[in-house]
């Protein structure tokens, strides 16, 4: 960089200082820098000249040229100029000339490298970059447990992951150690190795470490390699050519290729297609994605030393993520990462030291080593200083079990208290249907890309059934609605919501109104102003779409905030396929719970956090104590005040708890002797029921075909229709559902079901809800307030504490992972 710009074939009277500032020099000044010292002869008859490194702060009193490229190499003697790469690595001016001067033998090699670097990279292909990338020797650590010393390899040896895993002191490629070979482990370690660990060593490094053949390379082919911590000289990091247009627009950031050169993501061979941990250039709005060329805020907070130049951090972080998603079924350890850190020079030692810190941070944050991963007895994912904590987890639903699994894997003592006689909370699968698992609670995964549920399915070898988009709307009477009518009313429905979005832009909390009321107001105004009259069928189809919205909200639209009903859409959401978890969520829940200390039938009555330890008392009078407690009970239980806190929860937190609604959704599942719907539905995964009136819009709006080979349908009761269930028994609900099915398939005989169930979540004493929503005059901020810990002692998790992903098992799970990270940090 500075070397190639500051020196040219024609000598100038200007040279560059170590700080790249021009200095006027002369032959006289140069001679003053040459110091005479006695040679090895004691009589002083001969003298030897040497020159110190001109880099301010460099500790190398007698630099040694590592390159030895020129026949006139200075070795450890005198040279007119030393080029500093690190405090222990320099090359002489003679070796610089050997590669940089066009008439020298090494120029062709440097020139060829420069062309490759320029073609693929973004940084300057300077002589120093060339030396760091091509000429520095590799360093490797002895794998003998009793040794562990670092050794410098000779220049011709290329380090590989296999060599890094198996290296022993004195080992050379393709050779067999003879029995009479001396014990090379007894040889002392190079003194420069110790310096690498010092805090001042890394800031003195001239070239940032750029990994060769990184596992992350196939995932980052659309980026300039040197902007994401990889060497542009490796074929594995060569940028991909454009094969498809990007889906979003915008200018490229410093680490990205220009939009016209950008390429779509390419996956590592064998990696699950739902694993996309890195944003591609110009991509945005994808949940649980990181920018490979930028440090996140929490990373900068944890590693401020990389704020000026994040290259090393990005190189190691990106490598760790790629390794994790390549094999998420085993815990990723520093020992598994180290062989893949292929970089020349002493900086490899520093990278190996740093990868442990970075990996532990990413583990604590739940970025890696998460899901249903279990560790062997006595082994833990975090160092010993994390092990001295005890935690009580209240609730064995997805949030509680996610946190308990993480904390247990970290090495902490964890006890889970569950009120019911089973684990899972709102996850409850019915396995009594022949050949089919039907979830009484959730069973659908909305958006699989980077979804932790998809990760856990991969870990367990569970397949997810992709749901198609086709949903025929069937009217009572048996007619299938014309798709053009459905499309037109779907457009009108979304236009109504767009108007709501415009209306709320300048509205305060006190100006909020119910969403249902606002939609009706906008609809009436549109009809009046446009003069358009919708047909009876079009009005019914609109009611179907409103019913779907009530299903999404978990409540009648007259209870939901028009201002904040979709508050989470302002954050990146999970994209990709919508799938049905055919084995049910219970498979995941059971694996999360494996090996944990779970106390069933232990409803918590009070939590006292006035002392040094938290005292938790269950309804049977049993007392439990721990340093921390994590509360993961449903929102409805907090609203009911079923748990007494001492001191009481703050007014701010209680206001937030009560500003959210405890939504109710009920389900019915029916098994039939045969698939009577096949001829009409024709392979679709679900079909819709067009309600004849607004008063009937929440009754069995959608029927899901639970298995293409079996004869099971599942439907939902939503909105104001949920209240009608309270006055009916299960048989009456069944009869009403069968009446609707017979109307939808009027042209054929509908058999009686051989088995069925009707859920009653509203009457479950320790649940009483499906999922949360924002009530009128509420806001999404309430989710964050509920999630706030108290005095670093009492923590909260659950879907109603996850502002980004509420109402989902995914959101509940991630909230548990989030709190486990916070507990570990306190």
Swiss-Prot record:
A zinc finger (CW-type) spans 133-193. Expressed in growing oocytes and in intestinal gland. The keyword Transferase does not apply. One of its GO terms (biological process) is epigenetic programing of female pronucleus. It holds the Pfam family Amino_oxidase. Its EC number is 1.14.99.66. It comes from the Eukaryota. Zn(2+) 1 binds at residues 53, 58, 84, 90. The modification Phosphoserine is found at residues 17, 26, 253. Inhibited by tranylcypromine, but not by pargyline, deprenyl or rasagiline. Histone H3K4me1 and H3K4me2 demethylase activity is inhibited by DNA, this inhibition is released in complex with GLYR1. Zn(2+) 2 binds at residues 65, 73, 92, 95. GO terms for cellular component: nucleoplasm; nucleosome; nucleus. FAD binds at residues 389-445, 604, 799, 807-809. Its cofactor is FAD; Zn(2+). Optimum pH is 8.5. PANTHER family: FLAVIN MONOAMINE OXIDASE, LYSINE-SPECIFIC HISTONE DEMETHYLASE 2. Interacts with its cofactor GLYR1 at nucleosomes; this interaction stimulates H3K4me1 and H3K4me2 demethylation. In contrast to KDM1A, does not form a complex with RCOR1/CoREST. Possible accessory component of the polycomb repressive deubiquitinase (PR-DUB) complex, at least composed of BAP1, one of ASXL1, ASXL2 or (probably) ASXL3 and one of MBD5 or MBD6. The PR-DUB core associates with a number of accessory proteins, including FOXK1, FOXK2, KDM1B, HCFC1 and OGT; KDM1B specifically associates with ASXL2 PR-DUB complexes. This is Lysine-specific histone demethylase 1B. It comes from Mus musculus (Mouse).
